[in-house]
Regions:
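Auxiliary Fe-S-binding modules of radical SAM enzymes
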Residues: 17-22, 27-217
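Single conserved hydrophobic/aromatic residue that forms the stacking wall/gate
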Residues: 2-13, 215-218
Length: 219
């Protein structure tokens, strides 16, 4: 544990004024010409980061009653490890940085399914998401279909060719990739898009196409 990053985390839990710290893997795109070399994290190195973060988080919990240090969801997905339960994230202080987002989504989605809903007729819908979140979204849609057989949801994992590299988060998926990969494959008249794919308070993707235009082009 003599690496600088480990020593840095050790300094964090000695300072009680720090509310929370998140670790997020660097997204390596195809647009890194003339920049320093950045090797993407793989399953093994991601697991090592999780072990370090959880160890220091446990120590913070013992010292201060709060974990303070959190790995983002991406580390668990890259390492092939289960996303922690909601209790792990406490107050979700780092939710905007992708820490606990998947755990919270799963918890809220399943809680909503427990409520009674009246649904008439068959409902069809297409949903797009990033490659990282696709397994969880598919799992939740399967659970939805199990409880409500009249609802059909087709999940489309979108590979990020726009930015390339190892980018797999839903928030960086563009309309360009959605159109290219979904054209002729949509099975309904409704397209579900995660809010994180859109510009803040706007109905446009990062490449400035609107949701309605994207749906029209992809259908």
């Amino acid at each position: 544990r003599d690496q600088p990053r480990s020593r840095g985390l050790g300094d964090v839990y000695k300072r009680q004024m720090v509310q929370s710290v998140a670790a997020v893997p660097c997204g390596v795109t195809d647009y890194r010409q003339n920049l320093f070399k950045q090797t993407p994290y793989d399953a093994e190195t991601s697991a090592a980061v999780i072990d370090i973060m959880e160890e220091f988080g446990d120590e913070c919990k013992r010292r201060h009653g709060k974990r303070i240090i959190y790995p983002s969801d991406e580390w668990y997905l890259k390492a092939g490890r289960p996303i922690p339960e909601p209790e792990f994230y406490e107050d979700y202080d780092q939710l905007e940085n992708g820490v606990g987002m998947m755990s919270l989504f799963r918890e809220e989605f399943l809680a909503e399914l427990e409520k009674p809903h009246r649904i008439y007729g068959t409902k069809k819908m297409d949903v797009v998401t990033g490659t990282m979140a696709a397994p969880l979204i598919t799992e939740m849609m399967d659970e939805l279909r199990r409880q409500y057989p009249m609802i059909e949801v087709k999940v489309h994992p979108i590979k990020n060719n726009f930015f390339g590299g190892n980018v797999g988060v839903a928030g960086l998926v563009t309309a360009t990739d959605i159109i290219a990969q979904c054209e002729g494959r949509l099975s309904s008249g409704t397209l579900g898009v995660p809010a994180v794919m859109l510009r803040e308070e706007k109905d446009t993707f990062l490449d400035d196409m609107t949701v309605s235009y994207t749906h029209l082009r992809a259908h």
